[in-house]
């Protein structure tokens, strides 16, 4: 999966995989957004695992001298967002991700009417 990635997004995906993140998804937003180039979305089973995934990614970011703009949601550990400027990482507990996807689907259905 990570063979086609380079640079920061590759490091993020590898760091997440190192902590057994699952359902890892990389979205290329370069043609769709002026705010970031990629979203990396992944899941963990518990608050502790989600925080461990975030810690692993942050360690890799610091080692590689990339810029961290902000971290949101770390304390609660249900949905952590790491803004690395060119890559925004969303790390969900699996139930929170499922609910988030349901909300997005509902919003799309309601906005199409």
Regions found by a protein language model. Give the residues of each.
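N-terminal presequence-like segments and adjacent domain-start helices
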Residues: 1-5
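N-terminal first-folded block
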Residues: 6-38, 45-47
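Signal for well-folded cores of large energy- and translation-related assemblies
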Residues: 13, 17, 21, 58, ...
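Glycine/charge-rich, flexible interdomain linkers and switch-proximal surface loops
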Residues: 23, 27-33, 69-86
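Short aromatic/hydrophobic contact patches that present stacked aromatics
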Residues: 39-41, 81
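Compact, glycine-rich, soluble single-domain proteins
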Residues: 48-66, 81
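C-terminal structural segments of small proteins and small subunits
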Residues: 81, 85-105
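Conserved small/polar residues in nucleotide/adenosyl-binding loops
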Residues: 107-111
């Amino acid at each position: 999966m990570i063979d086609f990635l380079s640079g920061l997004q590759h490091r993020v995906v590898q760091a997440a995989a190192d902590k057994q993140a699952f359902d890892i998804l990389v979205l290329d937003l370069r043609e769709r957004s002026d705010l970031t180039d990629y979203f990396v979305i992944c899941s963990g089973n518990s608050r502790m695992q989600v925080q461990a995934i975030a810690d692993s990614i942050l360690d890799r970011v610091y080692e590689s001298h990339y810029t961290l703009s902000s971290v949101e949601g770390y304390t609660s550990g249900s949905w952590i967002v790491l803004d690395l400027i060119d890559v925004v990482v969303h790390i969900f507990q699996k139930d929170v991700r499922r609910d988030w996807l349901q909300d997005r689907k509902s919003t799309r259905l309601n906005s199409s009417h």
